[in-house]
Regions:
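A detector of single, family-specific signature residues
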Residues: 1-207
Length: 207
């Protein structure tokens, strides 16, 4: 919408526009934009207006396709017997991403195998012992590692005991990403337990 058209926007046109928007703008905000449009020094161009309309149409189409794809992913995930989404702070799309990367949990005998697959196990020094600095080896599935690290952020926010654990690591002098990798390992432990025993998440059992 050009400044010229914006300056002529009335309450009826606003109501129509509001109905078409996924995230409506308040009428007060519209009035502020309208006042700014009235005082804008510029010119009206049909070419620019057409380009804006085309860009908006493309954006809305892509946004709608993404929404349909996300709905399909959620539908497929929920049709399977995964328990990852029951963890407080982890949404269905994130859970679906983790599940898609791990696949069949029966293929993993121990949780350490999942840590290794995600490249989240601690690195070792030349003697073959864990060096204790919390650094990840970063081999394995980068996608799974990213899903788990991102999920670890909300996992610590929504679970007080995990938040305490995170800050304990920070107070030990570890940087955010290192402390978060420790949280991600705890998250893998929780996921492994839920999927192996097919039980829902119980925040009271998280330590």
């Amino acid at each position: 919408m050009t400044p010229k058209k914006m300056s002529k926007l009335d309450s009826n046109k606003y109501s129509k526009m509001k109905a078409e928007l996924k995230h409506p703008i308040s009428y007060q905000k519209i009035c502020q934009i309208k006042d700014a449009a009235i005082n804008t020094i510029g010119y009206s161009s049909e070419a620019i207006e057409y380009a804006l309309k085309t860009s908006l149409t493309t954006y809305l189409f892509i946004d709608n396709e993404i929404e349909k794809l996300e709905n399909k992913i959620s539908e497929l995930y929920l049709s399977l017997d995964y328990k990852i989404h029951t963890i407080k702070g982890i949404g269905i799309l994130t859970a679906a991403g983790i599940a898609s990367e791990i696949g069949n949990f029966d293929a993993f005998i121990t949780r350490n195998q999942i840590l290794a697959y995600a490249g989240l196990e601690p690195s070792k020094n030349d003697s073959g012992e864990h060096n204790g600095n919390g650094k990840m080896v970063k081999h394995g599935s980068a996608y799974l590692r990213n899903y788990l690290m991102n999920a670890a952020e909300t996992f610590r926010v929504y679970n007080p005991s995990i938040s305490d654990f995170y800050w304990k690591k920070r107070n030990e002098g570890k940087h955010h990403r290192v402390a978060l990798s420790h949280v991600a390992r705890k998250l893998v432990n929780v996921i492994f337990t839920l999927e192996k025993h097919k039980v829902d998440f119980n925040p009271n059992l998280v330590k």
